[in-house]
Amino acid sequence: MRKVILVSALLCGMAVVAGAQTKLSGKLTCAKPGVSETGGDGAQMIMFQKANCTWTTPFAIDGSKPGRTVDASIGDMAGSTGRAHGYSTSVMDNGDSTFVRYEGTSQMKKDGSATNKGTWRYVRGTGKFRGISGSGTFKGEAAADGSSWADVSGHYSLAKGKMKAK
């Protein structure tokens, strides 16, 4: 249970597509992730996670919106506190992709749900998103069943000659 909450909570804050410091915001929803637990002593767990996500409130950059998004991370949980870092890949509706690195923390509640927060930054893009840069924050929740959502906000810049978000 703890591993699913950590995975879901922290994976949600990632995959964003991000001129000159243009603001962006959206809402990302992730299904229950697949988890491979590497072991632990009962007080701490270390896990590899992968989740499929959808932008329920997408943003647009140069007319393209994010579609299929996959998050992969490594996390650890000690008691009710967790942390994770990973990467999120979004395939835009034009076929190009963006890649985000994220990290964050999670606090599990007694009912098995959790709150999460963290930061993200673009590491690269393909096609018209080549040279993308930017960063921001995420904050969200995970349900006891492992599904999760996060509000994502921040800013981005496209490489010289690229158009801004709509």
Locate predicted features.
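Beta-strand-enriched cores of mature, soluble protein domains
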Residues: 19-166
